[in-house]
Regions:
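Fe-S-dependent hydro-lyases/dehydratases of central metabolism
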Residues: 1-960
Length: 960
């Protein structure tokens, strides 16, 4: 069907002899004048809807709905958004590739053309999640860490190489080039695309990582989705989402001397969390926004998940052009981009009154002060001068008040650490909580990969003689994460601070684990060119690798004797890192206090050695002459930083660096041998296995949904289900599907051992996401998760770990792993349900949290609220998400886990309709409760009825 708005297809000029066609928003505005008042981010979405209007997936009504967007309307309509491309990281990319391979296998079994299973948009997988800080502090650390990385992940990398040759549009940026979001910003982002027929359109994307929003800093619409939704997007399906509110964020003034982009983003995060922007677009405007360079904008966009927004968007302007020039895009590309944005009348940052927003938040940049965030949440900003005092206060506060529940008199106690390597008692995976610690139902956030990876290196003993450690001591100091290492201003500041510190004779104690793990090779190039890298190395910040590393918990272990001292004395030690998340135990299981800081402050705290020192009123340390050295003595000025910026904005350097992705990917990557063929042969492997989602797959989908019938309602109902878990608030996707270490006594550990894998080769759950046998056994296996079905102890404590009570048909119960109970219920033909509190599924965009739930036979999750991506993923796997109404909760209903549950949704499965839950208790009584069905859009109804998004998409592809 021809586009109903074909008259909007216009031509624009981009210089002599260069022109392009485009679907013109100014032309559309003649029909819908409201378009001229739309936020810039929504205009990019509108262009996609307009261009892809085919009368089937996207209709003229969809175009009209977006064009007539009202800032304060109720949000009930969905937008079908076709993205230009998809980006992946390796922990989420490998299972996604396994699903694509399984689709081809299913097509082959049906005698269909496997070539129909092909990404219809460019897909780039950047390998960044697998390298760990095993070695650090020395110049050969990166080489040693990469060799270990390749040894641990050989099978995964072989599978990626198969994908590269099997799919025409699937590319891989090999290990050692950087972090997906920084590589996206510096290399993959184009600003605009052009089809073979000459039609140009905005760059846009989704990524299978929550911090995909970093790309918003260059005016590209994009956000994080689960792997399931990402697969649908790459196979040509629109990304469906409810029409959003767009919150305008007006920045005024300018940053004061000594403040950094990190200080700014921590202030923005704190402010927007208070304004509750979950599920909304945030768009920055105003004079202050115009003044920000793209790296500063990208830092703010990166942390959109931390302030809860779907995006933190910055429109394209002269600063964007400067950045594209400085990072090696060609002059022709940049001219074409600018001409296109001007033709769309979208070049430039809006000023107050130019655009209509749902609400406006304001911040004067001059009010921003040097800050850290922590010690447990990124939104808990602390002014630099208050860090020490805040730590002292929290030290003795109850855990429920964000404290550490310690006795105040032990705060300053020091503990001896022997320097010689001893055989230390292993730190338990499930350490008992102190009896005095209060218990509460808010689960901790711990999205971290493993410390106990295969082929782990033995950590060397503490150097430099016996030491003492105590509460507040900094034991990990990491310049890490794309959030900050993408920003030359703060990286040069760190190098300059290190230079001044070394020149004054300051040093870092050798027992502090220091590391530098930037998001691209260009960072070390410009630090080297500016002659600053040697000073960082002298303070222990030697290059450890290019990847996420400490930011995602790949910090490696501490020395055995330090671990033992922390564990035996229950010390509250600290990590200071330039990352974006600091949830408890994320960075290291024995480090309880984690602070986010700018790279120069990371270096400063490494020198100070403790967060109990007030760096505003106390010296950082003593110099070589024995004199006190203050932070002001070594803090670089903005003039000093700006003089070195030429080294960072080096177009030739960026082109040379990223030119090696294909030309010189490295000997380690070239040494990986991938298999050939259009379909994968699924050799026996504990890393990669054909997922079961297409077993018994047929081309026949569900029958058309009748207008209303009891039979239809009955078919979708959950009957006589058992409760498998009762959870509290803030259950994260890491609780549901951990990325970290695999216990040998867990169901996954048992399975690996049964298949010949020794404990030292377990690697992590994150690295084994290509094998459903491991992952389904690892679902709800986080050692810190608390199933409140289990009875409380005499002191009120709750047992931790993936356990439940299995109820047999005679009414008897038995404690066992959730996986084992789930398999028993499946064998009996009984479904199961989960009950939870607020923010169920918060944290990382982890599709296995939904896949594992489905494979355990769980039919529904009933919660007080859901995180956006996980709710979508549950629907995408055919699991019903349902929400309590009003103040209702499972606690208010008095559920214990002994009950059986019926859930009957609306007969038509209308989005956000009412469902009826019937609770049957052991005493024969029953109770009816109204729930809200959290299938939010019509397309999600189709996904659910097909058994999930993957069967739906495969039927679409093979029926075409």
């Amino acid at each position: 069907m021809p586009n109903a708005f074909a008259n909007t297809l216009q031509t624009f000029q981009a210089g002599p002899g260069r022109s392009g066609q485009f679907y013109s928003l100014p032309e559309l505005a003649k029909l819908y004048p409201n378009v001229r008042r739309l936020p810039m981010s929504l205009r990019i979405v509108l262009e996609s809807v307009l261009r892809n209007c085919d009368g089937r997936k996207i209709t003229a009504e969809h175009v009209e709905q977006v064009a007539n967007w009202s800032p304060t309307a109720s949000r009930t309509t969905e937008i079908p958004f076709v993205v230009a491309r998809v980006v992946l990281q390796d922990f989420t990319g490998v299972p996604l590739l396994a699903d694509l391979a399984a689709m081809r296998s299913a097509a082959q079994r049906l005698g269909k053309d496997v070539g129909r299973i092909e990404p219809l948009v460019p897909v780039d997988l950047v390998v960044d999640h697998s390298i760990m800080v095993d070695h650090y502090g020395k110049t050969d650390a990166i080489d040693l860490n990469m060799k270990l990385e390749f040894r641990r992940n050989k099978e995964r990398y072989q599978f990626m190489k198969w994908g590269m040759q099997a799919f025409d549009t699937f590319g891989v940026v090999p290990p050692g080039f950087g972090i997906v979001h920084q590589v996206n910003l510096e290399y993959l982002a184009r600003g605009i695309h052009q089809r073979a027929d000459g039609v140009c359109y905005f760059d846009s994307l989704v990524g299978t990582d929550s911090h995909t929003t970093m790309i918003n800093g260059v005016g590209v619409v994009g956000w994080g989705v689960g792997g399931i939704e990402g697969e649908a997007a790459m196979l040509g399906q629109p990304v469906y989402f409810l029409t959003p509110d767009v919150v305008g964020f007006e920045l005024t003034g300018k940053l004061r001397e000594g403040c950094t982009a990190t200080d700014l983003v921590l202030s923005v995060t704190e402010l927007l969390r208070k304004h509750k922007v979950v599920g909304k677009f945030v768009e920055f405007f105003g004079e202050g926004t115009r003044s920000l360079a793209v790296p500063d904008r990208a830092t703010i966009g990166n942390m959109a998940p931390e302030y809860g927004a779907t995006m933190g968007f910055f429109p394209v302007d002269e600063r964007t052009i400067d950045y594209f020039e400085g990072t090696g895009r060609t002059r022709d590309q940049i001219k074409f981009l600018e001409a296109y944005f001007r033709a769309q009348q979208m070049f430039g940052v809006p000023m107050p009154g130019d655009v209509d927003y749902s609400a406006v938040v304001k911040l004067d940049l001059g009010d921003v002060t040097p800050s850290l965030s922590g010690p447990k949440r990124p939104q808990d900003r602390i002014e630099l001068g208050k860090v020490a005092g805040t730590f002292r206060t929290l030290f003795s506060k109850p855990i429920a008040e964000n404290g550490f529940n310690q006795q105040p008199e032990v705060l300053l106690t020091r503990h001896q650490v022997e320097s010689e390597l001893q055989t230390a008692a292993p730190v338990p995976d499930n350490p008992p909580t102190r009896l005095a610690a209060p218990r509460y139902e808010v689960e901790m956030e711990a999205n971290k990969p493993t410390l106990r990876a295969s082929h782990a290196t033995s950590v060397p003993p503490v150097e430099g003689g016996d030491i003492t450690i105590g509460n507040g001591d900094v034991l990990i100091a990491a310049i890490t994460s794309c959030t900050n290492t993408s920003n030359p201003g703060v990286m040069l500041a760190a190098g300059l601070l290190a230079k001044k510190a070394v020149e004054k004779g300051l040093r870092v104690q050798p027992h502090i684990k220091t590391s530098l793990s930037p998001g691209s090779r260009m960072v070390t190039e410009y630090l080297r060119d500016a002659k600053l890298l040697p000073y960082l190395e002298q303070l222990g910040f030697a290059l450890a690798g290019y990847g996420c590393m400490t930011c995602i918990g790949n910090s490696g272990d501490l020395t055995p004797e330090i671990n033992e001292a922390i564990s035996q004395s229950d010390l509250v030690c600290a990590a200071v890192l330039s990352g974006n998340r600091n949830f408890e135990a994320r960075i290291h299981p024995n480090i309880k206090a984690n602070f986010l800081a700018s790279p120069p402050l990371v270096v400063a705290y490494a020198i100070a050695g403790t967060v109990l020192k007030d760096l505003m009123t106390e010296p950082v340390g003593k110099g070589k002459d024995g004199k006190d050295v203050w932070l002001g003595d070594i803090w670089p000025s903005s003039d000093e930083i700006n003089k070195l910026m030429k080294h960072a904005m080096n177009p030739k350097g960026y082109r040379n660096s990223y030119g090696k992705v294909k030309a010189e990917p490295g000997a380690l990557w070239q040494g990986i041998e991938g298999v050939a063929g259009d379909t994968y042969s699924w050799p026996t492997s504990t890393y990669i296995a054909e997922p079961p989602f297409f077993e018994g797959f047929t081309l026949e989908g569900p029958p058309p949904l009748p207008a209303a019938s009891a039979a239809a309602a009955s078919k979708e109902a959950v009957r006589d289900a058992r409760i498998i878990a009762l959870f509290g608030d803030s259950i994260t996707t890491d609780h549901i599907s951990p990325a970290g270490s695999i216990k040998d006594t867990s169901p996954a550990g048992r399975w690996l051992q049964e298949h010949g894998v020794v404990k030292t080769d377990f690697n992590s759950y994150g690295s084994r996401r290509g094998n459903h046998e491991v992952m389904m056994r690892g679902t709800f296996a986080n050692v810190r998760i608390r199933n409140l079905m289990l009875p409380a102890g005499p002191d009120g404590s709750r047992e931790e770990g993936g356990l439940t009570l299995y109820w047999d048909r005679q009414g008897g119960s038995q404690k066992m792993f959730i996986y084992d109970a789930a398999m028993k219920y499946i064998s009996e033909g009984r479904g199961t349900v989960i009950f939870a509190g607020e923010e169920y599924g918060t944290g990382s965009s982890r599709d296995w949290a939904a896949k594992g739930t489905q494979l355990l036979g769980i039919k529904a999750v009933v919660a007080r609220s859901f995180e956006r991506i996980h709710r979508s993923n549950l629907v995408g796997m055919g699991v019903l998400p349902l929400q309590f109404q009003g103040d209702m909760s499972w606690q208010a209903l008095g559920l214990t886990g002994e009950e059986t549950i019926d859930i009957v949704p609306d007969a038509q499965l209308r989005p956000q309709s009412q469902a009826e839950m019937v609770i049957r208790r052991p005493d024969g009584t029953r109770q009816e409760v109204k729930l809200t069905l959290r299938i939010d859009t019509p397309i999600e109804v189709d996904y659910y009825r097909h058994g999930g998004i993957l069967p739906y998409v495969l039927r679409q592809l093979l029926a075409g």
